[in-house]
Amino acid sequence: MKVVTFGEVLLRFSKRDDYRLTQGAQMEAHFGGSEANAAVSLAMLGNEVRYVSCLPETAMGKACEQRLREMGLNTRFINWGGPRIGTYFFEQAASLRPSRVVYDRKDSAFYNLHPGMIPWRDVFRGADVFHCS
């Protein structure tokens, strides 16, 4: 099946060992986001997946694209521009404390996408399914 996914890649920062965001100095970083996660899962199941998004033309943006390609995604339709990747900070639940997520997405590369920047006819050519959320 040929799938097109459209959405923002996010850079997730999380603490280790059930620490709160305010505790300790170290964080782990991973690329993700709902559409990126769905796209990778679909690719791992053997589908041909085109990932449509926007990334900053920085070392971090290039690292993100490389990781998406390593996971089997076609990144041909990623736009380049904007100042940064949207981020979120994740605090794992512990004991009676619930998980917590803090988003920082304003002025991300994806936030700066505008009509006409994506060649949708080319994106959807031959596609069977479209996923976005």
Model-predicted regions and their roles:
Residues 1-73, 110-116:
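Glycine-rich phosphate/adenosyl-contacting loop at the front of the ribokinase-like
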Residues 48-132:
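Conserved N-terminal subdomain of the carbohydrate kinase-like
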